[in-house]
Amino acid sequence: LETQPIDINSEYEDGHFYVTLNKGVKDLKLFYQINQDETVLYDSTFIISESANIKTWAIKNDVSYGDSLEIELYEHKGLDARIANLKVYSKTYDGGGDDAIVNGLRGGLNFRDGHWQGYFGTDFEATITLDSIQRIDSVISSFYQYNLSWIFMPKQILVYTSVDGDNYYKRAKLSPSISVKQEGQFFEEFVLTFPEV
């Protein structure tokens, strides 16, 4: 894979996202905007306390270098969740590791940005354990499609819940209606709602 000029990393701790930008190439100046606000020259980790859009870009010798990178950070109940029973994902598209499915960071339109987790020849499956028993009434997930690169939406999304970790009950089922023939690069957010449990 080609080197990306910018890599975005985010850690969530004590109610805050700690965001770090890394240069993929030497001698770059990195800039960012939060929620399309003022442009800031990046010099160190910055802190965000709520859901936000982050746009970053690189400059080298006063000229734009590579494509800009745009991601979304989402605050949600599962940010500190433990992940188990995660099926093996592609090493090429690991999304940042096991916690990529709950880290609150959604990738952009470039599937090579390092923030999408991909599966080949196997279904995605994982058990997400929250740090305490909590009431939930929905699960939101985002999926990416770019048919020219053989990246497709799931055929079906199922959500099960459990209070004790042993007995699971199906709460929601969704079958996305997006055709595999639909052209272009895009992602869709799916909201699966169910009676509060």
Predicted region positions:
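Catalytic cores of secreted or luminal carbohydrate-active enzymes
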Residues: 1-3
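Disordered, acidic Ser/Thr/Pro-rich linker "stalks" and the adjacent N-terminal cap
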Residues: 5, 68-133, 144-151, 180-184
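Short proline/glycine-enriched turn/loop motifs at strand-loop junctions of beta-rich domains
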Residues: 23-28, 133-136, 154, 197
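Solvent-exposed segments in extracellular or luminal domains encompassing
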Residues: 44-53
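Short, exposed coil/turn segments at beta-strand boundaries within extracellular/luminal domains
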Residues: 61-68
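Trp- and acidic/polar-enriched beta-sheet ligand-binding modules for extracellular glycan
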Residues: 120-123, 148-197
